[in-house]
Amino acid sequence: MTKEYKTITEISGPLVFVEKTEPVGYGELVEIRTASGEVKRGQVLDTSDEIVVVQVFEGTGGLSKDSSVRFTGDVIKMPLSPSIIGRVLSGSGRPRDGGPPIVPEVEREIIGAAINPASREKPRAFIQTGISTIDGTNTLVRGQKLPIFSGAGLPHNDVALQIARQAKVLGEAEEFAVVFCAMGITNEEAQHFMADFERTGALERAVIFLNLADDPAVERLLTPKLGLTTAEYLAFDLDMHVLVIYTDMTNYCESLRQMGAAREEVPGRRGYPGYMYTDLATNYERAGIIKGKKGSITQFPILTMPGDDITHPIPDLSGYITEGQLIVSRELHRKGIYPPIDIRPSLSRLMNSGIGAGHTREDHRAVSDQLYAYYAEGCDLRGLAAIVGKEALSERDKLILEFADQFERRFVNQGRDEDRSIIETLTIGWELLSMLPETMLTRIDDKFIKKYHPKYAGTAKKE
């Protein structure tokens, strides 16, 4: 029989301090009953011989020292069944779509563990997102964790939605699902997400967790863990390939800082807790493929860099854990280019595992390298032209400058509903490279030039 205690000594922000009257486990689920009879849920955050610290998910409004506390002896679990696909849930896992509660086939603890490195399968399968700057130059591979580093006011949410509805594995009929975790978003953003999912039919293969800006901040710490627990069930129990998209991890980290301040912890860099790196890793490292299992988890975390500062602790620490990054550029956005992904500072560390013959096409790496090289040189020449004038540039430099402009207009820029195949992306790449003399294509093997260059493509097909 569980006991209820009226031993609250202090209420501070989202935290309740309770005098310890029985052995209590870390992470244990707590129920707190207010004077009006309302029951609020919480979790044991810290425990010692004298005091138990409880974080309350629904906020501490209405609580007093007379409120009763009950320790359940259990941890937070996520109810799971195949019918969860297509559902919209709150940041704490409760139905938000007006539907019935989930009738679970299994219940899983939400505090999962990273996949054992010895049990991991190397990510190899190419995921086509339909976005050229990702598929062509920063390829996403199944089982990878590839974040988007963005800034306030940039269209990263539109990019996330486009990936959610277009992502697919080529040549495979295996089931594909999306787990979408939104943290600290506004009501307007939530309506935008839901309208897009319903308009495109993507909701039929998605599970959505919505934590709004006016929801308790502590709930934000649960949202990605609930989403990942759901993804693990879909991937490793139901053999599905799951893409997990979080937006915005910056709001998640702000909640961590808020909790640390409420507990009066010694802060780390810029006031964030010293364990933020470890906490982020417990989320990111739940991506991957397990040997002997058919399913996989691929992660697409999205975070807004405060002040567009890539050295800020949140993007800085995320970059150490994840396998690359996609950078959303304010400069490209000002030019009206969508998606404004700047390929120069972007990187996919697992790209080589998922491209080439048998995955995309044999010329993929060479075309990508050549596009990178001349686009980067063209961007440098823009700075030079601004100083000395375009007329002072050599003919070669003018050609590369024009190439960079065309690259942004034709390769980077595409419609919000435009789903390009990898062949279309590579074809656009070759058309751009055909602007340059063949002697300048130094990073591409002659056999690829003879086979795929627009000048020879028709001849190659006839032969």
Curated annotation (Swiss-Prot):
Top-level taxon of origin: Archaea
Coiled coil: none
GO biological process: proton motive force-driven plasma membrane ATP synthesis
Pfam families according to UniProt: ATP-synt_ab, ATP-synt_ab_N, ATP-synt_VA_C
Molecular functions per Gene Ontology: ATP binding; proton-transporting ATP synthase activity, rotational mechanism
Subcellular location: Cell membrane
GO cellular component: plasma membrane
Membrane topology: Peripheral membrane protein
Family matches, as InterPro entries: ATP-synt_VA_C, ATPase_a/bsu_AS, ATPase_F1/V1/A1_a/bsu_N, ATPase_F1/V1/A1_a/bsu_nucl-bd, P-loop_NTPase, V-ATPase_su_B/beta
Keywords: ATP synthesis, Cell membrane, Hydrogen ion transport, Ion transport, Membrane, Transport
NCBIfam families xref list: PRK04196.1
Family note: Belongs to the ATPase alpha/beta chains family.
Biological role: Component of the A-type ATP synthase that produces ATP from ADP in the presence of a proton gradient across the membrane. The B chain is a regulatory subunit.
Record note on quaternary structure: Has multiple subunits with at least A(3), B(3), C, D, E, F, H, I and proteolipid K(x).
Name listed for the protein in its UniProt record: A-type ATP synthase subunit B
Organism: Methanothrix thermoacetophila (strain DSM 6194 / JCM 14653 / NBRC 101360 / PT)
Gene designation: atpB
